[in-house]
Each structure stands twice: as structure tokens, then as C-alpha cells.
């Protein structure tokens, strides 16, 4: 382990918390400061679209109690001077560092008049709206956030319309067969689907679509993706392009003392021909925060590449949907277990005959098997 005296971690969500925990557990005993834009202790985001909307507020991440006094909550990094190794905060304070972990996350894309769901405050505000008696909820975007909000709203007895620009919800992430099944699953559970069209404007409860139609709803919620929080790095000298560009080891490109982790990190993945990827899911932030911290302590020459197989899981109307790898890179997909008509199946995705992704619906054991095959670079 190389000698570092001061480490700053920017971002107090999952990746930042895991970085702090790992630094201490790996023996770093120098000055360690965690900067978090939110006033809350680090919390789990996946429940925000599920249990929090139903009334649960206990989402604190295990390990948050380990943070101690060197945690600046409610403070935001606004500038990085990589030359002088200084992070500038929104109150004018300057934090010097020998090592820096960039885990500043991402923020939701917004549309005027639309509720978004990223923070605990977002979830509590949306819950208050649901509790106020709104009967018809319109969800923009059928990704995992949109699907979970639609599920929760139906559980609460609300009428739900889901608008998605693709041919089926989650078509890009799940592939044609699983996305087609998901569309039917939504409809069987009472969700009205409007697909293949974009929302262009929301005024009050009026939602205008790209084809000229206007839909009405009491409450409009958006799950339209996120944008990485990199503006504070402008002028820092770090390479930024849809995230912080990194080496395979998560070191910021060209840097020997800055690493990145979580939603903000974009790095070349060896399983995919060193294609640059950025992953926005819980499991990636969980693992990447720890690996980035270990690599920062080890130094660039001893750092290990991060090559975990990306994976995520969601529950939609009682069905467990899991993915591994990057199905959207495939030129072939094939059902390899179960049957979509029986609501239990697994799909393998390949490019040039080699597995690159998998999707499983109510088939966790098949997903585990396929994930191992992806990591091994096996043929479909």
C-alpha cells in the first residue's frame, strides 16, 4: 500500500460509502473526508420506488454509522483543481487531498410538470401526492424506475398509464422477447400501455405526445433516465464524456491520484472488447466503490482491472426480473430455459456467438448460471 495522508470522497451514496468503508478496512489511517450533497445519512435508493412509496422510511444503508466526524453532509463539490489537488465546496471551503474518489453519481432527466424519483425527498413528495387522493397516475418511461412506480401505484389501487418511446417497455435492456412478455405482464396487471411515442410537453395534468394525442392524469411521474454529475469537474483537466473517463482500473484517465466509481464512472470493460460502459445499478456501485478504493491505496501500477459482469434486478407486479451483462450489444437472443407463456424463463444474448448478456424472469438459478458463462466468455 502506498503512502497517502489525505483522501477525499465526493459523493455519499452507495459507491462513496463503500469506498470509505474499504479505505478504513484496508488500513488507511490518514485524514478521510466524505462530501455528501444530501443532508441524510447514506441510504438505499432501490426501495424509493417501492416500499418508501408504500410508507416505509427506513432506508439507511448498513455501515453508515461508521462514517464518524469526517463527513460533510449537505455540502456539494463545485470545482476540482487537479493541479493543486483541491476540491472546492459550495460554501467556499477547500479540501486538499493526496487521493480522490469521484462518486458524485447522477441526477434524473427532468421535464416541467413531472415528478422524478431519485432522492428520499423525491420519494416522500411523491408519496404525499399518492396519499392525497390522486386516482390516475401517468408514468413516463418504462425502465426499471418507471416499472416499479407503476407496480406500486397499482398496488395502491391507482389507475396507471405507462408511456414509453420504445416498442415495449425496457426493450433495449431486456431484448425483444422479454420486453414483449413484460408488456403483456403490465397489461395483465391493469396498466394501460402507450408505446412507440414520446412525451413532448406536460401542462398540469395534460400530457402531449409526439403524435399529437393528449392524455390526462392526476399525477405525472417520470423515469426518463439520468445524467452523470460531472459539471463540477469542468476545467479540472479530467476527461469527461458521459461520465468520468477511466482506465480499466477505475483511475481517471491520465491521473495517478483520482479514481471514480458508481453512476459517474465510465470505463473500458475487457469482456466487451474494452468498450466504454457506464452502469447505473446498485450492484455496480456496491462493488465498484470498494475496488476503486483498494486501487487508490495500491497505486496505479498495482491496481487491478474492474471487470465484474454488470447485473441488476427489479420486481414488477410480483415478477422478479434479473439481467446480467449487456444484452443490448447482442446480435442474437435465444430462450434457453423455461417458457414466457409460463412466466418463468431465461434468455441468452450473444454477439458473434459469444455470450454477452442474459435476462431471467422468475428464474434466478438460470441467471446465476448464465452470468458465470458470460464471465468465462463462453459460446451461446
Model-derived segments and spans:
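A short, polar/charged loop-to-alpha-helix boundary motif
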Residues: 364-378
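Short loop/edge segments at beta-strand edges and connector loops
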Residues: 73-75, 81-82, 118, 164, ...
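Rossmann-like dinucleotide-binding cores of NAD(P)H-dependent redox enzymes
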Residues: 134-136, 144-200, 308-316
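FAD-binding core/adjacent interface of flavoenzyme oxidoreductases
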Residues: 2-8, 60, 66-138, 208-210, ...
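Mid-to-C-terminal Rossmann-like scaffold of FAD/NAD(P)H-dependent oxidoreductases
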Residues: 2-5, 266-364
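Glycine-rich Rossmann-fold phosphate-binding loop(s) that bind the pyrophosphate
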Residues: 11-14, 37, 118-119, 140-143
Amino acid at each position: 500500500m502506498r503512502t497517502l495522508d489525505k483522501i477525499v470522497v465526493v459523493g455519499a451514496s452507495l459507491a462513496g460509502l463503500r469506498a470509505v468503508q474499504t479505505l478504513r478496512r484496508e488500513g488507511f489511517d490518514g485524514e478521510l473526508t466524505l462530501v455528501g450533497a444530501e443532508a441524510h445519512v447514506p441510504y438505499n435508493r432501490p426501495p424509493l420506488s417501492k416500499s418508501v412509496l408504500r410508507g416505509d422510511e427506513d432506508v439507511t444503508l448498513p455501515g453508515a454509522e461508521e462514517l464518524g466526524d469526517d463527513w460533510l453532509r449537505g455540502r456539494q463539490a463545485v470545482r476540482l483543481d487537479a493541479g493543486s489537488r483541491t476540491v472546492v465546496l459550495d460554501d467556499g471551503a477547500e479540501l486538499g487531498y493526496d487521493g480522490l474518489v469521484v462518486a458524485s453519481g447522477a441526477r434524473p432527466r427532468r421535464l416541467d410538470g413531472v415528478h422524478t424519483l431519485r432522492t428520499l425527498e423525491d420519494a416522500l413528495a411523491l408519496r404525499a401526492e399518492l396519499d392525497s387522493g390522486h386516482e390516475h397516475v401517468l408514468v413516463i418511461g418504462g425502465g426499471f424506475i418507471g416499472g416499479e412506480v407503476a407496480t406500486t401505484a397499482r398496488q395502491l389501487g391507482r389507475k396507471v398509464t405507462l408511456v414509453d418511446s420504445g416498442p415495449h417497455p425496457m426493450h433495449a435492456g431486456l431484448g425483444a422477447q422479454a420486453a414483449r412478455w413484460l408488456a403483456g405482464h403490465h397489461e395483465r396487471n391493469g396498466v394501460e400501455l402507450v408505446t412507440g411515442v414520446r412525451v413532448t410537453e406536460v401542462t398540469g395534468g395534460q400530457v402531449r405526445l409526439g403524435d399529437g394525442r393528449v392524455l390526462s392524469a392526476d399525477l405525472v411521474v417520470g423515469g426518463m433516465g439520468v445524467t452523470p454529475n460531472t459539471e463540477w469537474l469542468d476545467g479540472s483537466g479530467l476527461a469527461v464524456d458521459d461520465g468520468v473517463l477511466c482506465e480499466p482500473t477505475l483511475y481517471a484517465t491520465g491521473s495517478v491520484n483520482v479514481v471514480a466509481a458508481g453512476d459517474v464512472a465510465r470505463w473500458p470493460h475487457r469482456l466487451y472488447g474494452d468498450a466504454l460502459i457506464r452502469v447505473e445499478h446498485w450492484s455496480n456501485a456496491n462493488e465498484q466503490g470498494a475496488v476503486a478504493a483498494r486501487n487508490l491505496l495500491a497505486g496505479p501500477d498495482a491496481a487491478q482491472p474492474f471487470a465484474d459482469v454488470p447485473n441488476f434486478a427489479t420486481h414488477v407486479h410480483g415478477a422478479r426480473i434479473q439481467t446480467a451483462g449487456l444484452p443490448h450489444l447482442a446480435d442474437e437472443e435465444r430462450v434457453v430455459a423455461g417458457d414466457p407463456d409460463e412466466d418463468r424463463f431465461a434468455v441468452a444474448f450473444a454477439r458473434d456467438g459469444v455470450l454477452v448478456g442474459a435476462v431471467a424472469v422468475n428464474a434466478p438459478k438460470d441467471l446465476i448460471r448464465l452470468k458465470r458463462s458470460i464471465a468465462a466468455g463462453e459460446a451461446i
